[in-house]
Amino acid sequence: QWLVRNSQKLDKPWLLAVNFVNPHDIMFFSSGEKQERSRANPRFMAPLRPPPNDPIYKKDWSHLPLPASFAKETLRDKPWCHRSYAQVIDSIYGHMDKDDEAAWLANQSYYFNCIRDVSRQVDHVLQALEDSGQLDNTIIVYTADHGEMAGAHGLRQKGPVTYKENSRVPLIVSHPDVSGGRTVNKLGSALDLVPTLVGLATEGTTTTDTPGVDLSPALTGQ
């Protein structure tokens, strides 16, 4: 709405941040009554809820297996912080029995459908960009704050741990003047977003004193 409403007045550089809550708040998904009853305080922050009544959430992904480490690993041989974190999560959001594979698969299906929902909303934003006439003059950055353990290594949510599942998130940059299709296998951080955006917008002629590194050279394979 902002893009369409203001497209004729955008005569100087602009930044639009579009933020989607889910799948971040997957911790409030209810896998069943057993999980709900095991919460230490059912009224803490928010109740657990089933998927929204939306066709996109009707898709069942239970034919896809859980992460391989879900069955292979247990918390017994993990560092203390893993077990402590799992206990806190169980207390706040309810316990999910590892033997209840159906509950974990339902949790995974909800997560996948949240991602599909985000894709649908991103399509709306891209369509608004095109309708506003700004699509070919806009740098688009798509990223996330963290991943989801989803049962990997016996954990869920993000956790005080560093695994591929919770630390490897998408960072996709589309630049109208740069050909796409390039994959760069280098580390980046959310701290790098501001200096990278400044570098892209000013073609590297301006820097900032904010933390982080300008990743814009990676667009051309540097």
Set out the residue ranges of the language-model regions.
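Short beta-strand/turn segments that mark the catalytic/cofactor-handling region
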Residues: 222
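C-terminal lobe and pocket-closing loops
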Residues: 209-213
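Active-site-proximal cap/lid insertion segments
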Residues: 6-12, 20-137, 141-187, 200-207
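Long, well-ordered early-domain segments
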Residues: 1-2
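Generic recognition of well-ordered alpha-helical segments
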Residues: 168, 189-200, 214, 218
